[in-house]
């Protein structure tokens, strides 16, 4: 006589499914203390012989900032950007200086100067011809000695992106500084200082209450 198949306990299955969905719906910042801080970072930008430079934007950008090192998660909300040109009005500058913000690929990702240079051409456009990164500024050579400022909301990192990062928490961003198309009489030395860059970063971080 053939043995009848065991009946499934649908009640237990429903409990398992309910518990699984409940765990998935709990955000990773649940039970953590949320706070918003503003930090400021200032640096001089040099010509560096037509090389791109990558500055990683994250709460530890400034050595003595108010972001605790024990924070469980953080994200950048806004970047207030200001560039003061040191270039001489009489040097006959031609070309542009560009700043762009791109999402980092993960918490521990790093970008070298050479990689930043390749990113300028590789990541500017997607397959459909749409801009993938956020340009901050355009030409400044026509108005030297003037401030160039802008408030930028960084592009959101898509869910399910590389390194398994959820949303944009702890991923950070890179500011790519490109002076390759700028020429002038006072840029003969690759160490020539183009100007001063000031960044005010508004970020949210979550810490444990204990």
Curated annotation (Swiss-Prot):
Compartment(s) of residence: Virion
Biased composition range(s): Basic residues: 1-14
Key words of the record: Capsid protein, T=1 icosahedral capsid protein, Virion
GO cellular component, one term: T=1 icosahedral viral capsid
Region annotation (Disordered) ranges: 1-21
Keyword Acetylation: no
Role according to the record: Capsid protein self-assembles to form a baciliform capsid with a T=1 symmetry, about 18 nm in diameter. The capsid encapsulates three genomic RNAs (Potential).
Protein name stated in the entry: Capsid protein
Species annotation: Ourmia melon virus (isolate Melon/Iran/VE9) (OuMV)
